From Swiss-Prot:
It comes from Salinibacter ruber (strain DSM 13855 / M31). This is Small ribosomal subunit protein uS4. Residues 1-44 are annotated as: Disordered. Residues 1-13 have a biased composition (Basic residues). The gene is rpsD. SMART domains: Ribosomal_S4, S4. PROSITE patterns: RIBOSOMAL_S4, S4.
Length: 200
């Protein structure tokens, strides 16, 4: 299965949530796309609800099925609540960290920045979006990339801050302080549904 590159508005309308950020299309048409989007739909099965939650999470973080399942398997081997560990591992990806720090406007853009070698971790270029952050890792924009207008604009307009991250706009450098707690992660995801799906 290839990574989805189609209209993000359709995905947001399917899940009735702005999973890629503010969506004017969702505001105008807060119902699923398609000919029968506004019609009353029959009650979804338990499996359908669980599958939809998994798909929503995959789209939110930009993962393919194999990547997502591998991360779930890793979370299931960790001590603690599997669903919470899954979300924490998703948040600890380098592409997500670049997005949360405001270096990139979207996770898709963050993946591009990483893949195009604009991002450094502990002063070494890392071009793997799935790279897992560790506490006290320092993320920075490569010096030769700091003059890119798109990155400068993103950093300048960064608004949200997160307790597990530090960011110095002037230096274009931030720190992954520690793994976030579940309650600190703002995504509207019911991770227990995903655990139940994979437990079948």
């Amino acid at each position: 299965m290839a990574r989805y590159r189609g209209p993000k508005q359709k995905i947001a309308r399917r899940f009735k949530e702005p999973i890629f950020g503010p969506s004017k299309a969702l505001e105008r048409k807060p119902y699923p796309p398609g000919q029968h989007g506004q019609s009353r739909r029959r009650r979804e099965s338990e499996y359908a609800v669980q599958l939809k939650e998994k798909q929503k999470t995959k789209y939110t973080y930009g993962l393919l099925e194999r990547q997502f399942k591998n991360l779930f398997d890793k979370a299931s081997r960790m001590q603690g609540v599997t669903g919470e560990k899954l979300l924490i591992l998703l948040e600890a990806r380098l592409d997500n960290t670049v997005f949360r720090m405001g270096i990139a406007r979207t996770r898709r853009q963050a993946r591009q920045f990483v893949a195009h070698r604009h991002i450094m971790v502990n002063d070494e270029v890392v071009d793997i979006p799935s790279y897992e952050m560790s506490p006290d890792d320092v993320v920075s924009v490569k010096p030769s990339s700091q003059d890119l207008e798109v990155i400068q604009t993103n950093v300048e307009h960064r608004q949200r801050t997160f307790s597990w991250l530090e960011m110095d706009r002037q230096e274009m450098k931030g720190k992954f302080i520690d793994y976030p707690n579940r309650e600190e992660i703002p995504e509207n995801i019911d991770e227990q549904l995903i655990v139940e799906l994979y437990s079948k």
